[in-house]
From Swiss-Prot:
Protein name per Swiss-Prot or TrEMBL: Exportin-T
Described function: tRNA nucleus export receptor which facilitates tRNA translocation across the nuclear pore complex. Involved in pre-tRNA splicing, probably by affecting the interaction of pre-tRNA with splicing endonuclease.
Main location as per UniProt: nucleus
Domain of life: Eukaryota
Upper taxonomic lineage: Eukaryota, Fungi, Dikarya, Ascomycota, Pezizomycotina
BP term (GO), one: tRNA re-export from nucleus
UniProt KW Hydrolase keyword: no
Places the protein is found: Nucleus; Cytoplasm
Pfam family for this entry, one: Exportin-T
Keywords recorded for this protein, A-Z: Cytoplasm, Nucleus, RNA-binding, Transport, tRNA processing, tRNA-binding
GO cellular component: cytoplasm; nuclear matrix; nuclear pore
Native organism: Sclerotinia sclerotiorum (strain ATCC 18683 / 1980 / Ss-1) (White mold)
Amino acid sequence: MDAQIEKAIEIAWDPRSDQNLKEQAVQYLTQVRGDSSSLQACLNLFTRDPKAAEVVRLVSLDIVNNAIQTQHIDDQSLRGLKEQLHDYVRRTYASGNEVDPPALQNKLTQTLTFLFSSLYKEGWESFIRDFLSFTGHQNGTVDNLPGVVLYLRLLSSIHDEIADLMIVRAGGETKRNVELKDLVRARDVQIVAGSFQHILTYWQGNNDAIVEMTLKVIGKWVSWIDISLVVNQDILNLLFPLVGRNPNGGEDKVKDAAIDCFTEIVAKKMKPSDKIGMILFLNLGEVVSQLIASPALHDLRNTSSYDTDLAEAVAKLVNNVVSDLVKILEDTKVEPEVRAQAEQSLQTFLPLLLRFFSDEYDEICATVIPSLTELNTFLRKAQPLPPAYSAMLTPILNAIIQKMRYDDTSSYADEDELTDEAEFQELRKRLQVLQKTIAAVDEALYVDVLSNVIGNTFQRLDQQNGQIDWRDLDLALHEMYLFGELTLVNGGLYAKSQPSSIAAERLIVMMSKMVESGIASFNHPAISLQYMEICVRYCSFFENQTQYIPQVLEQFVGFVHHNHSRVRIRSWYLFHRFVKHLRGQVGNVAETIIQSISDLLPLKAEVPKESDDDMSSEDGSHDAADVAFNAQLNLYEAIGCISSTTSTPIEKQAIYARTIMNPLFSDVQRHLEQAKSGNAQAVLQIHHIIFALGSLAHGFSDWSPGEGKRAGQAPAKEITIEFSRAAEAILFALEALKSSSEIRNAARSSFSRLMGVMGVAMLPLLPRWIDGLLTQSSSKEEIGMFLRLLDQVVFGFKKDIHEVLNSLLTPLFQRVFASLSEPVTGTDDGIQLAELRREYLSFVTVILNNELGSVLVSEQNQAFFDPLVQSVTTLAKTVTNETGNLAASKIAFSVMTKMAELWGGPTIATPGQPITSSVQPQPTFPGFDTFLIERFHPVCWEVLREPHFRPMVDAQSKSVLNELAGLEHVIYMKTGNMFVEHLQGNFFPSMGVDGSGFIKSMVESPERKGLATFLQNWLKGRA
């Protein structure tokens, strides 16, 4: 069998093997892996002499490994494996013979670790001592290198297997590991700790790799053994020289490992008094101070030889110490003496923490952010702050602010540094959180420090005639941007034309200085962007200080022409935001602005190349074109805002609109014939033009019909006339190119924006919009989005839309029903179908809720009423688990309830009160009472009898049940005794169901909730 397994492994791992033969070999090895009788053969292949090929030995031992780990081996065989492997290790690792390659050593370590887990409790109690004995050629020595390496590998692997808290384990495995750790502590921990000392003593200065391995093992084991076994003078006398060695720099893994070892020692959980005692005993403050002062971390700090690994290791140690000190101080039960010691230690460690926090390397800074966050949180809670704590705030805040600054070596927005830039902005966000915490602790200090930083920078800019490092100015502007958040919390900059707070007062001064300082002309893209962002964020300043608006507008005109693409593109959006906020204050400047930026308005569509994947080319050029176009739309909207200010006469507004739109109309005519013949560039050009027209309209008026508070802002007639031309141009293009999804999407977007400038003038055009937007090729998603737009139109123009809605309803529903009936072709299509169902039902709901229900039953739409009801009832009773079914069912039941309320006639039965049998239903339409009982009511019980419908355990189903109960309630209220008699004499008997409980609950429950509760309990009983 040994030979068969060996041959199979050789074939399976030989790339030259025949594929069929290789498959047979793999299949055979799979059988071997599951056959416990083959384990001895596999072990023989690993241990035999002469040795088999490395791959044969590796695979064979892996099969043994798998059997031990999965417990597919009996105790007798397990002990046999133990004896054979123990003998192999003695022959190979204790005798000085040639040892196994690294990969086999790893696999052997893994196998022995599994044997430890299985046999250390009973069967191999001497495991650790046995392998320790292999570390020396004579008793008491540890001079056998192969044996020492294997011993340390095993100790490390045992920790990983039974004590690593980062690994999630099953309950039984956790219990086993606890028992094993207890056994190790009782039997061998003293021996293990002693071996650490012996190995370090013998190999220090002889083999750094062994010393590094030993330190890493100590760092692991210290978390679960008695700390005194490691923190004692003998061990420390060996550790401290390692921490302090090689002070002149250069990579030193042993030194880093020694520091990491201290870090793990500090991280060990213990009582506050013991923890502070250990920190003081180890004299860690002095140790860290000496490390920081060493040439490796001090003299070489700003050079390429700076030891970042060492810095990160020491920073991690400092982070752990400070975190522990904060936890001690947070503990209200700590003794006064311990608290005093912790406070003193914190004073010692804060400068050390800030040293690494302010490190030029962000990775090192990030290492100590967790403990600094904990410290700031502690200070925020420790109100009122004692003087010793208050004194900490200023150095912390100064360090945070300084860390916000770009490094001297950084180059803003270079292509090669975009990743670094993104990482720095992420760091700034983390620093902002820390800064906010300081503001929460002492707002007055925060205001003073930031005011000084910003004010001093502006002063230097003035004194040095603009000759200042852009990084300093960027820092001041960034802090100014953040500083204003204090004013936003307090309700804005002004209260009754006066500064709302001290922070607001300071920001107002900063804003004035910023605008007056000439920063806008500072030649650096980061400064230009920061300046614009601040102007937009604190627009309320300009609402009160209007004298600055012309100057800033002129500056924006410069920014929108900036030679740096990032600044230029971003400025188009920010310019729009600025004028939109201040349209009431900018005055009659439209003509000047239009002339100044007219060169930026021409649209130029760029079609992606055929080689582009997913509409984006490798060099990102198409993405850039998309970004530029979307930003360009902001210019059109900005012109709309400026052109429609209250200080601009209506006649002038119309002229400005015409001036912008006429070139766009000509452009449509110029490209339409090419677009109709399939020219992609022409289609995209018209797509861009349609979007631009919509953006201009939105700038003129973002008024939405139905906004009661803004009813007076309905569009002026002159403006409506101008934009009616835009609507005609868009419809003209849409009707010619409605097969293009790009054109439909652009038209749909512009449709919603034209509503604001056209008002009721849009209504007669609705049939043409529907014909163009809802075509044979329109997706379910497109139809759903358009129905959502129609919801707004119906709601906004409910007094004017009746006739138009009446005429377009049947063709609209025909398009919707055709799409609803299409087969689902995939997951995305299923999601779109669910969304379309919801939008369709919501549209019907809007019609019913806005007193327009008569259009559903008008003479013109009467033929479509039955298909409408059929579709609603079908969706109501579809409650299976497919995407969106329950959401649609809920809306469908609410639609049926609304129909019952509208057309069921007056209420003739009040739940909770006696039935008056003499009162007959009086529906709005003859026979609608019977319709409710025979068409709507059975739908409720189809749902209730659906096995998948489980409102007891599903929240969405419960919502459906609530709507269902509401429908039954309304049917009863409209039909009274007629409904009860139908239930008693016909419906329930035909179902073979005792409906007396249902009838009683329906009649006696004053609200639908009572009936819903009854039905839920009834369903529970059925289950």
